[in-house]
């Protein structure tokens, strides 16, 4: 729990920092400090190993630029030396004018692009320090210095918590269809595609590198000997990310997971003309959740044989072209791809050049706040599609912030996918039965529909009973002191409670996970009740208005 408490404490400090205002800022600024502490621990670990073998070791960061020198000088008792440790304006000035320029130079001085040193230069070339207060910066440094990355347990806990911060960032960044891909879904996709040592794994829209990190976790269990490990480290994972912050996070995320020098580059995948892709460029495995609904310049659209304005459809063409013959892919995409008329040519291309063997239909709520339904396409290149196995995921509950998708939800899919078994949730479609537009819509022929034997009159009575019960329950829950004029005006806006009310004076991020879930559940219940209240207020108000109008007519009649 040390990492969770530290991350929460750092977020609280950053909330008071003028240069940071969003979850994206919190993650970015925490990341570069965490990264430098990680490098210091890595240097110490390598120094010990070198000393035990009698070898010389040159640390990655040298002299005063080491974390242990500028950030956390220690007393003889092992505590931070408050006398010699910089703080305030001196610390902020050192970071901006000396540390960052020093780190950016690594891109020029590294022996090759395939080194950790080069990646350090790349990362800090994209970064700037947004923590303008040197006092806030000192507080954060002291918190991070308490963390350690020596043991496997330490590293695992850190990556788990780092992923949770990435999740917050992903759900805060909603431009151009960018959403955080739930890790249980990624792990399931990786298991189905089953990448092997010696195969290349590619994500051309890698975001925070979730697919690449999970593929690494999966494949490292297959490592036998130093040659396999070298292959996994240097010649396996490839990613491209267009935007600077996700690129930085992706690179750090892979390093934290254990890939020393990730092959992730910053660039626009869609700027690559399909006609320029050579056999040597192609990859054996593609795992991706491409952005949807974004926009590209006209010259970028010209790189694709099938004309489209939808970025996800451009990426689909790229995937098909980039796969080696015999290569495998697992792709998350909006379910409208299956049926939209403007995607029919692309569906036909996919079915002709690849074996689209599996479509996993995901329920709403998998991507929090996205408001779209998605599917996962599993296909192999080199053989045309003859049959498609569908699986309609039904977790038996509404997915959301407090009811996220889990690996248990996907267990039945994984089990049945091995044999393409038919069930209430799965079925097979023969491609020869498809129409000219190759409509791949999810139409479950095996779903058991409960037949309602009630008469129309009985159904109407049930609806009336439900409306009356709901209205009574809501009125019981309402307290009229939430409205002005002692509850006389039911249709006025609620009066906000004072900010200093005791039960509102708390820090959400400081709560335990259990309490957070309780708060989230209460928020959802309140939101649902407010929605119901709005639904019943309108007809009630209309009835009252009608009665008041009749009342006014009677008064006017008597005045005459």
What are these regions (language model features)?
Residues 376, 380-412:
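Conserved P-loop NTPase
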Residues 220, 255, 291, 321-324, ...:
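Hydrophobic alpha-helix feature that most strongly marks membrane-spanning transmembrane helices
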Residues 176-288, 293-295, 300, 307-309, ...:
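Conserved S-adenosyl-L-methionine
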Residues 1-197, 265-272, 277, 361-364, ...:
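Non-catalytic, mostly N-terminal accessory regions of nucleic-acid modification and defense proteins
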Residues 13, 147, 164, 168, ...:
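Conserved, well-folded catalytic cores of nucleic-acid-processing
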Residues 22, 244-247, 308-379:
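Conserved Class I SAM-dependent methyltransferase catalytic core
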Residues 41, 244-245, 270-271, 291-294, ...:
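Conserved nucleotide-binding/hydrolysis micro-motifs of P-loop NTPases
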Residues 23, 282, 286, 372-373, ...:
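A generic structural signal for well-ordered coil/turn residues at beta-strand boundaries
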